[in-house]
């Protein structure tokens, strides 16, 4: 079976914003992520923000609603088409482009903020992606991210449970070899001039098997998640860095 199979995003692009679509679960994560991001930026008004790996536009529209000047890029042309149409229908002026994280089509020192969520574990070249994010950030600009740790527990939950058993996410969409340990990402960012790094656990699942079951049942009943932003980075983690 193919790993890191990103064809799923093309296949679901047309239904991206449908509340019953499986991909729509990602939209529920934005308020949770921004609980953390807002600790570091309290006013998004007029900031120039790039979403790398924007998909059909969940995070872009969330930030645009806060008054930011938003740009989105994704390697799925189908997702970009959907994102443009949905933004237009909701009167959002968002600049969407087809492209790759490893070769961002923007000038140096363009953005106040770069957001990259649910993406770093999928890119073809993580080192080049981080270098490009640094390049397009203005001095003092913020990089916000989340991704999946490379641990036995993360593979158990993300692959065995969510892909294989519950089939809540498509089989093969992740390659556990591409999951990223926090220390690896921190070293990579610092080597590329991204400092003032902070990493926190983005804990959607709890610490025990019963916590995992309860979180899943809550999601099936309500369509939503509860999150703890803490020191438990064993499955997912969230963080920030600054270009200095």
Regions found by a protein language model. Give the residues of each.
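Conserved class I S-adenosyl-L-methionine
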Residues: 144-167
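A short acidic, Gly/Pro-enriched loop at the edge of an enzyme's catalytic core
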Residues: 102-113
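Conserved alpha-helix/loop element of class I SAM-dependent methyltransferases that forms part
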Residues: 27-47
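Acceptor-substrate binding/catalytic loop of class I
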Residues: 147, 167-184
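A short glycine-rich, Lys/Arg-flanked "PGG" loop and its adjoining helix->strand segment in the class I
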Residues: 127-139
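Class I SAM-dependent methyltransferase SAM/SAH-binding core
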Residues: 50, 57-103
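A C-terminal cap/extension of S-adenosyl-L-methionine-dependent methyltransferases
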Residues: 90, 187, 191, 196-244
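N-terminal, positively charged/glycine-rich alpha-helical extensions of SAM-dependent methyltransferases
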Residues: 1-17
């Amino acid at each position: 079976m193919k790993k890191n199979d990103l064809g799923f995003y093309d296949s679901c692009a047309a239904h991206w914003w449908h509340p019953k679509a499986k991909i729509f679960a990602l939209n529920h994560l934005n308020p949770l992520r921004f609980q953390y991001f807002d600790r570091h930026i309290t006013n998004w008004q007029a900031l120039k923000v790039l979403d790398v790996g924007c998909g059909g536009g969940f995070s872009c529209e969330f930030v645009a609603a806060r008054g930011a000047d938003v740009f989105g890029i994704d390697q799925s042309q189908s997702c970009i088409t959907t994102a443009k149409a949905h933004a237009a229908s909701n009167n959002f002026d968002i600049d969407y482009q087809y492209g790759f994280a490893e070769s961002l089509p923007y000038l140096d020192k363009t953005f106040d903020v770069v957001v990259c969520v649910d993406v770093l574990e999928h890119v073809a070249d993580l080192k080049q992606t981080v270098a490009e994010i640094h390049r397009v950030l203005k001095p003092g600009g913020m990089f916000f991210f989340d991704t999946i740790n490379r641990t036995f527990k993360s593979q158990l939950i993300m692959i065995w449970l969510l892909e294989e058993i519950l089939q809540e996410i498509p089989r093969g969409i992740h390659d556990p070899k591409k999951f990223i340990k926090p220390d690896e990402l921190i070293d990579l960012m610092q080597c590329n001039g991204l400092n003032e790094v902070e990493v926190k656990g983005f804990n959607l699942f709890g610490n025990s098997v019963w916590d995992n079951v309860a979180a899943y049942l809550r999601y099936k009943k309500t369509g939503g998640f509860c999150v703890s932003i803490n020191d438990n980075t064993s499955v997912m983690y969230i963080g920030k860095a600054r270009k200095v």
